[in-house]
């Protein structure tokens, strides 16, 4: 059973079984019992932090699965090997855990910098880069800064629930942008295909050759019947179950039953309609727009350079989960486009000493880079602000640990990477909905509307484990589907991330409901910490042709 102090009050939250949590607050001399959903049961203490209640008393992982997601063994039958002498190993050997950091809330006053206001824990990124012990190996893009100008800014709430905006998205986004479909490893053999669904649009993405992938609209050219209703393997044709018209996997016509009754029609139905296809980093992308700009132009050079060294195409997909969320896809996605929410949403993470307050936020066209580098165990809202020298010392110690941990996974290839690359876990975003983490972070997010319902979405999470170049990979992990009421802990392959997602998804549906009643009917997004969200909405408004205030 879990037992945690609150990072601000020091009150002890202790699971007592059956989804109940006892909270003892010595400072107030009060205690109470609550359900993990926040419902008060008994006691003088009648209010407690709902997010910590959920973490302590909510759905839990099976024994042995509550492992930090970055240290999960790529394969379930393997064990994680920690570097000898590493910080975590030292605590394990001592039979204890790192001390929990508790401190009174004092607030973060911020600090003025040449680039604008930042958290008072701010350490210039160049300081860490200039003192990198392998500075000569740093990619040039690590030095580039591109904070998004302006802000704070208002965004109308109608964008999140009005069906009109969903319909505009279909026409001006989903029919026009490069969007991730699957991993190449998901369709490894000729004839393997993936059914990609976005709003009411459907595409069959099929491997037609060892180095060729095509995308076809999933509709018979006779009466429109879907050609396939799920993913599949080793297809040699796509035959319509209605009247038997059949196309080869490259989209060319194979058989037209009763052709005698369709004089002059064969030429019009001889090739399935399709979409452009591109592969990058082991991912498969499509763009339905025949006039679409090349993928490399869409992403911009900064994104391609940023990921080049880490070779996402070599990764092994160790987890693949899709969950239905009762919220608009933008509401869900924006919960993962800033780190500031850690303060209230994930209070247990503050017990390690950090708030994720000093990440760098950059915007390069369609690609936003979030949380590029952070300043160690700073917690400015509790007055914990380490010096630059302390930040650098922590940064290097973490890099040393990560280097030795990764050596066990990718061997001597790890020597190609700098301190900054070893520590980076930026949660970046390629417009509109694709977020592969940078550095050696394993997480990939994708958010899509669930059919034509603007009040529901699909949150897709993958974990891509480091994998040695040239080492044979087993088949990728099969996808797990979770319904709207299923807890993330039903996906133990996520490790500790499952508990974190439970907290995020405690907020997301309630945000969506609140936006429908909010007055005034707009959201304020901040100048810096929510700048990538502002950039997203500016891009969104341009593509949809929205007037000011829409």
Predicted regions and their residues:
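N-terminal pre-ligand scaffold of iron-sulfur
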Residues: 98, 104-230, 276-279
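A short, structured beta-strand/loop element
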Residues: 14-34
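A short beta-strand micro-motif
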Residues: 2-8
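C-terminal catalytic domain of Rieske-type non-heme iron oxygenases
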Residues: 102, 107-118, 122, 212, ...
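Short Pro/Gly-enriched beta-strand edge/turn motifs at strand-loop
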Residues: 175-186, 256-260, 425-431
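Short beta-strand micro-motifs enriched in acidic
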Residues: 14-18, 206-208, 448-452
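Mixed-charge, Lys/Arg-enriched low-complexity segments
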Residues: 34-92, 99
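Rieske [2Fe-2S] iron-sulfur-binding domain
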Residues: 186-290, 294-306
């Amino acid at each position: 059973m879990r037992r945690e102090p609150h990072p601000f009050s020091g009150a002890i939250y202790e699971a007592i079984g059956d989804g109940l949590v006892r909270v003892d607050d010595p400072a107030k001399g009060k205690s109470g019992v609550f359900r993990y959903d926040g419902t008060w049961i008994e006691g003088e203490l009648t209010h407690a932090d709902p997010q910590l209640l959920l973490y302590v008393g909510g759905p839990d992982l099976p024994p042995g699965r509550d492992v930090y997601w970055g240290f999960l063994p790529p394969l379930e039958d393997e064990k994680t090997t920690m570097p000898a002498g590493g910080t975590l190993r030292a605590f394990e050997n001592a039979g204890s855990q790192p001390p929990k950091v508790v401190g009174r809330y004092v607030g973060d006053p911020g600090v003025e910098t040449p680039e604008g206001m930042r958290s008072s824990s701010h350490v210039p990124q160049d300081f860490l880069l200039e003192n990198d012990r392998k500075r000569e190996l740093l990619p040039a893009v690590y030095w580039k800064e591109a904070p998004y100008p302006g802000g704070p800014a208002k965004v109308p709430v109608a964008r999140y629930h009005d069906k009109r905006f969903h319909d505009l998205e279909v026409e001006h986004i989903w029919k026009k942008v490069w969007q991730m479909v699957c991993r190449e490893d998901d369709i490894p053999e000729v004839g393997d295909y993936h059914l990609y669904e976005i709003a009411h649009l459907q595409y069959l993405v099929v491997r037609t050759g060892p180095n060729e992938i095509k995308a076809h609209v999933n509709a018979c050219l006779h009466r429109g019947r879907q050609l396939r209703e799920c993913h599949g393997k080793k297809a040699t044709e796509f035959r319509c179950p209605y009247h038997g018209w059949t196309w080869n996997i490259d989209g060319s016509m194979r058989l037209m039953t009763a052709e005698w009754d369709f004089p002059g029609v064969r030429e019009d139905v001889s090739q399935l309609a399709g979409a452009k296809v591109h592969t990058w980093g082991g991912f498969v992308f499509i763009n339905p727009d025949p006039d679409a700009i090349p993928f490399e132009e869409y992403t911009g050079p900064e994104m391609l350079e940023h990921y080049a060294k880490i070779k996402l195409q070599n990764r092994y997909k160790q987890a693949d989960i899709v969950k239905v969320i009762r919220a608009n896809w933008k509401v869900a996605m924006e919960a993962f486009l800033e780190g500031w929410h850690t303060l209230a949403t994930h209070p247990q993470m503050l017990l390690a000493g950090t708030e994720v307050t000093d990440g760098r936020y950059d915007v390069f066209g369609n690609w936003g880079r979030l949380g590029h580098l952070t300043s160690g165990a700073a917690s400015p809202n509790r007055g914990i602000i380490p010096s630059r020298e302390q930040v650098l010392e922590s940064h290097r110690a973490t890099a040393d640990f990560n280097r030795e941990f990764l050596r066990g996974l990718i061997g001597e290839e790890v020597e190609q990477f700098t301190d900054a690359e070893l520590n980076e876990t930026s949660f970046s975003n390629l417009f509109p909905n694709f977020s592969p983490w940078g550095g050696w972070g394993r997480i990939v997010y994708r958010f899509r509307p669930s059919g034509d319902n603007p009040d529901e979405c699909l949150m897709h999470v993958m974990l891509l484990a480091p994998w040695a170049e040239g080492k044979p990979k087993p088949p990728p992990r099969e996808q797990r589907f979770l319904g709207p009421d299923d807890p993330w802990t039903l996906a133990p392959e996520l490790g500790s991330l499952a508990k974190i997602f439970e907290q995020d998804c405690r907020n997301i549906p309630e945000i969506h409901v609140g936006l429908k009643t909010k007055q005034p009917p707009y959201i304020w997004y901040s100048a810096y910490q929510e700048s990538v969200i502002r950039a997203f909405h500016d891009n969104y408004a341009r593509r949809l042709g929205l007037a000011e205030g829409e």
